[in-house]
């Protein structure tokens, strides 16, 4: 598992958000719908196992409430693993990524609100579908111990109070956005899964409130006819949880790390009118990150480092495998080059891209000789560094330069 540095991870979070902006609204809804389905399916698995145990002390087969909660918490991260690996859209994670992109002036406020609204609507429809078709119609949760477990769950969720539920939402989305940050920082699938599992388990064990998970659970409780009314679920749980999740993702994670890294790796005063990411999938979208993660040395033979403001989006890999091999010095040099150019808006502006050769020593020699017909200058004989090469005489110039003065290997 390779973990990138925090400034580099911050740049990948921006790229991650820009990819979400480029989604058509129908695709955004579909991917958000699937994220809601995954949340519901994981919730179904959690209820099937954790809800099947009794916590009554009089029952000899009973388990403690803490063990029951840990069983639930250990299964629930499967939903987030499915969301990350399939590229589905989860509202709670988007609160951090889209806010950072907006603060970086890479998207407009309309694009931010459109993404939030689309992802929340799709998540809600997905949880409703999962609660009705994948749980209510097929899974027998209408009897004990499952019905008692869901009845207790709904009653406890509306009994926290507005302030407590809001703060539980703040803590929950802080963990969720940290999980997204950890996933971006990791290089391989196994590392992403391992890094994702612990934050999700932590928020479930802490009894924090997640708006999308609560949408599935409380809709299922309403379908089963628990004692808690739907109005109380909305007023005393769903609404404060939604606001708390927004504050946790935007305030504790998005604003904090934007403030922490913006003077170092952000655009700052170099931002131009043309740096806003377009909403069309066919338009170019600026990328702050360079060489894709996970590619071998041979595949990066003639890779291009995108400039700060212009790089084709199609050249980048998927989020599951992207990263940057650039260090902070490379990023600063790119910003310095970009600031010396005369910047202007418009989609027809073309940027100069630098080719990077990442050959090892043997590949460099063979490639220069076979592909370009050139000799490796490192193998050429070197002259005395203390002497200057003789000047070229008119006779040697006229005869084609056969003397030592015309030798291309002479060095000063």
Swiss-Prot record:
Membrane topology recorded in Swiss-Prot or TrEMBL: Multi-pass membrane protein
A GO molecular function held by the record: high-affinity secondary active nitrite transmembrane transporter activity
Reaction(s) catalysed by this chain's protein: (S)-lactate(in) + H(+)(in) = (S)-lactate(out) + H(+)(out); formate(in) + H(+)(in) = formate(out) + H(+)(out); pyruvate(out) + H(+)(out) = pyruvate(in) + H(+)(in); acetate(out) + H(+)(out) = acetate(in) + H(+)(in)
Predominant location: membrane
Family recorded in the similarity comment: Belongs to the FNT transporter (TC 1.A.16) family.
PANTHER family, sorted: FORMATE TRANSPORTER-RELATED, FORMATE_NITRATE FAMILY TRANSPORTER (EUROFUNG)
Protein's recorded name: Formate-nitrite transporter 1
Protein source organism: Toxoplasma gondii (strain ATCC 50611 / Me49)
